[in-house]
Amino acid sequence: MLAFTWIALRFIHFTSLMLVFGFAMYGAWLAPLTIRRLLAKRFLRLQQHAAVWSLISATAMLAVQGGLMGTGWTDVFSPNIWQAVLQTQFGGIWLWQIVLALVTLIVALMQPRNMPRLLFMLTTAQFILLAGVGHATLNEGVTAKIHQTNHAIHLICAAAWFGGLLPVLWCMQLIKGRWRHQAIQALMRFSWCGHFAVIGVLASGVLNALLITGFPPTLTTYWGQLLLLKAILVMIMVVIALANRYVLVPRMRQDEDRAAPWFVWMTKLEWAIGAVVLVIISLLATLEPF
């Protein structure tokens, strides 16, 4: 039960962070200036809720880690165990994760003028911190630095891809209104950015696997089999993304009324598969790769 709680908290934390990152990415960079305020208003409530869950899950994960290190649920609620966790490498990094999650929530609630850029930088910093815990710390020396840097790139690219899909769906709603031109601009910018994000996810994901298990990656363990399932699901997402961009988008120029609903449905499917991938990632963190 404690392990399941850890998996659930990791899923909530990753998903929340990626949503805040994706919305901030649109508000700070991808959306044209004329609709940035409109997008910020549309995403604000969801961003705030995601920031709350990010902070709650990060804090709870520190306590649950104490239970995993100790004797179970009793140690989850022990301040002495929390202090012991903070003395570990995980605890030292995770304390900053909690601090940044708190600052992210404060920014989302206070809504300063440059909020999207601040949230973008804060969530990026949290993904970099996440690369300093887990399987990315298995190596030593220069290899460890390469692995952690690569894992940070993997997380940021994944957040740009997965976190940007919900804003895509909302921009599709704007296409039929007065903001049509600006919405199309935002979608095209995300498409351009998405190409790099997908390539980054694939390249860094392969390198991550090689740095953890070596070549060829092992498929005899539960960890290896889950990694293979994750890779298959990611490739399905790639196929959907390519079909959207290079099949449905050209068709929208000819018959928007028929192609647009398919585009929306496929994007929802892509997002749902991405959520399943995040569940698998959360589960992989609890397993030994060997």
Curated annotation (Swiss-Prot):
Positions in the Periplasmic compartment: 1-10, 71-89, 139-151, 217-222, 282-290
Alphabetized Pfam families for the sequence: CopD
Name assigned to this protein: Inner membrane protein YebZ
Stretches assigned to the Cytoplasmic side: 32-49, 111-117, 173-195, 244-260
Record keyword Membrane present: yes
Protein's cellular compartments: Cell inner membrane
Protein species of origin: Escherichia coli (strain K12)
Family: Belongs to the CopD family.
Keyword Mitochondrion attached: no
GO cellular component term, pick one: plasma membrane
Keywords of the record: Cell inner membrane, Cell membrane, Membrane, Transmembrane, Transmembrane helix
Membrane topology annotation: Multi-pass membrane protein
UniProt cross-references to PANTHER family, sorted A to Z: INNER MEMBRANE PROTEIN YEBZ (PTHR34820:SF4)
Species classification: Bacteria, Pseudomonadati, Pseudomonadota, Gammaproteobacteria, Enterobacterales
